[in-house]
Amino acid sequence: MLEVNVGTMIIATGFQTFDARRTPYYGYGKYENVYTALEVERLVNASGPTNGEVVTRDGKHPKSVGIIHCVGSRDEKTHKWCSRVCCMYSLKLAHLIKEHTGAEVYNFYIDMRTPGKGYEEFYD
């Protein structure tokens, strides 16, 4: 057995991204400017395809953005359970979009779940 003294340990169990085309009623793959969270994450990233500049696929800066929570979770047709990460991840993206564009950001959710110390304040 190997013993290692470390300050932090990260256990990454892995995950599989949800295919947003499984929820066609949101328009992913049908409407040009409907994105997955991972695609938005790449847009706001300085090393992303637009060097951190948040633009739509037609190259325009959005004036308003809608973020739909729980896509693929809490849904009888996909997964019935709450992932416990989507709300905070969506709120993080909302802050980043607002910071990068000044656009008005609207969050659409069943109910906001922020289970953690200081998380509810992040929502405000």
Language-model regions, residue ranges each:
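Residues forming the flavin
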Residues: 1-124
